[in-house]
């Protein structure tokens, strides 16, 4: 199958590498013309994922029309902020009918829409829209280390066709029709990873980390259920699986944000040092607004938002959570 990957960050590049190494032709495209030239010349993404050479089956395209030609699937792997404009480009290039998966995680700022909802709004006639989510770091996938992720869509027939087409010995795929649950799990776990990074950076120990992960899962489940998701989805790869990896893994950008804030650094300084997008930071406010809309109590999210707004110190965040009134779990 010909696959088009839009977005050449670390995750987009890792997915392009993976699928091109497992029987697919892949075209990789990004808006950044300088990055396109660099990748074409070096046959490697030295900016986003250095150290991994591109196989012959991976084509880097300067023209989106070339990238979309004969494509059977589009993966949009931009930041959430770039998702809508990428979907609009598909329409502009006459490719709005192509099957499309959002492989980014978060809520769109200002609208509060989940990734698949953005795609549905921009491409209302497209019946093959979904998300790819689950516990997976770009570096490990590029090294062909095993992982398992979820493909979710409201279109069950399409997912049943797509899963065996994309399933490999490196990336095991599971299908789901609970696209809300899969999308919410992927979005909100980034917020919880900032909290665990904060706790780890303050050296509060493994007990505190376990408590934050567990209560974070409770917050995610409450919100997802209120939005129409199946609670059992939160017990799977797109829920607790992604949460554990992002909250504990050394490669987690969002956890690194928490670690940096615990050191007393300004948020903008932390983000510059990381050098990549942290969806957790841009998602916090929309998660909190959505929780308010559904009248869901999300204390971890709320206190983190106060931290980002400089209304609390890192120490006060943890203290506030521990001082909450006693209650039954």
Swiss-Prot record:
GO annotation, cellular component aspect: cytosol
Task: Summarize where NADPH binds, as residue positions.
Answer: 10-11, 31, 105, 138, 253, 277, 279
Record-annotated residues binding sn-glycerol 3-phosphate? 105, 134, 136, 189, 242, 252-254
InterPro entries on file: 6-PGluconate_DH-like_C_sf, 6PGD_dom2, G3P_DH_NAD-dep, G3P_DH_NAD-dep_C, G3P_DH_NAD-dep_N, NAD(P)-bd_dom_sf
Question: In its UniProt record, which GO terms are filed under biological process?
Answer: carbohydrate metabolic process; glycerol-3-phosphate biosynthetic process; glycerol-3-phosphate catabolic process; glycerol-3-phosphate metabolic process; glycerophospholipid metabolic process; phospholipid biosynthetic process
Residues of the active site are 189
PROSITE patterns per record = NAD_G3PDH
Keyword list (alphabetical) reads:
Cytoplasm, Lipid biosynthesis, Lipid metabolism, NAD, NADP, Nucleotide-binding, Oxidoreductase, Phospholipid biosynthesis, Phospholipid metabolism
**Where is this gene product found?**
Cytoplasm
From the UniProt annotation, give the residues forming the signal peptide.
none
- Catalytic function, reaction form: sn-glycerol 3-phosphate + NAD(+) = dihydroxyacetone phosphate + NADH + H(+); sn-glycerol 3-phosphate + NADP(+) = dihydroxyacetone phosphate + NADPH + H(+)
Source taxon at top rank: Bacteria
User: Which pathway does this chain act in?
Assistant: Membrane lipid metabolism; glycerophospholipid metabolism
Q: Which Pfam family, an example, fits this chain?
A: NAD_Gly3P_dh_C
**Catalytic activity, EC:** 1.1.1.94
Q: Does the keyword Cell membrane apply?
A: no
**Which HAMAP family does the protein's record reference?**
NAD_Glyc3P_dehydrog (MF_00394)
Record function comment: Catalyzes the reduction of the glycolytic intermediate dihydroxyacetone phosphate (DHAP) to sn-glycerol 3-phosphate (G3P), the key precursor for phospholipid synthesis.
Q: Which family does it belong to?
A: Belongs to the NAD-dependent glycerol-3-phosphate dehydrogenase family.
Protein name as it appears in the record: Glycerol-3-phosphate dehydrogenase [NAD(P)+]
**What lineage is on file?**
Bacteria, Pseudomonadati, Pseudomonadota, Betaproteobacteria, Neisseriales
């Amino acid at each position: 199958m010909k696959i088009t990957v839009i977005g050449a960050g670390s995750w987009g590049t890792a997915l392009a590498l993976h699928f091109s190494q497992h029987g697919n032709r892949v075209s990789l495209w990004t808006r950044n013309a300088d990055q396109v030239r660099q990748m074409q010349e070096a046959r490697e993404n030295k900016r986003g994922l250095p150290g991994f050479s591109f196989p012959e089956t991976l084509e880097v395209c300067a023209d989106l029309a070339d990238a979309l030609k004969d494509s059977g699937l589009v993966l949009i792997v931009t930041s959430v902020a770039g998702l809508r404009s990428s979907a609009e480009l598909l329409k502009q290039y006459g490719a709005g009918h192509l099957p499309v998966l959002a492989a980014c995680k978060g809520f769109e700022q200002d609208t509060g829409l989940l990734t698949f909802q953005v795609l549905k709004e921009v491409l209302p006639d497209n019946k093959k829209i979904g998300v790819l989510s689950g516990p997976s770091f770009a570096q490990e996938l590029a090294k062909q280390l095993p992982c398992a992720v979820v493909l979710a869509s409201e279109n069950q027939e399409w997912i049943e066709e797509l899963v065996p087409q994309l399933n490999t010995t490196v990336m095991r795929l599971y299908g789901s029709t609970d696209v809300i649950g899969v999308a919410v799990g992927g979005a909100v776990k980034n917020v919880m990873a900032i909290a665990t990074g904060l706790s780890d950076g303050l050296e509060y120990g493994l007990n505190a980390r376990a408590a934050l992960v567990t209560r974070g899962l409770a917050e995610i489940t409450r919100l997802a259920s209120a939005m129409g998701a199946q609670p059992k989805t939160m017990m799977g790869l797109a829920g607790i699986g992604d949460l554990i990896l992002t909250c504990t893994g050394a490669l987690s950008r969002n956890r690194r944000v928490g670690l940096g804030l615990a050191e007393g650094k300004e948020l903008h300084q932390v983000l510059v040092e990381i050098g990549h997008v942290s969806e957790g930071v841009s998602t916090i406010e929309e998660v909190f607004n959505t929780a308010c809309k559904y009248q869901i109590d999300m204390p971890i999210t709320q206190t983190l938002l106060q931290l980002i707004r400089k209304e609390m110190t890192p120490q006060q965040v943890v203290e506030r959570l521990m001082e909450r009134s006693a209650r039954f779990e």
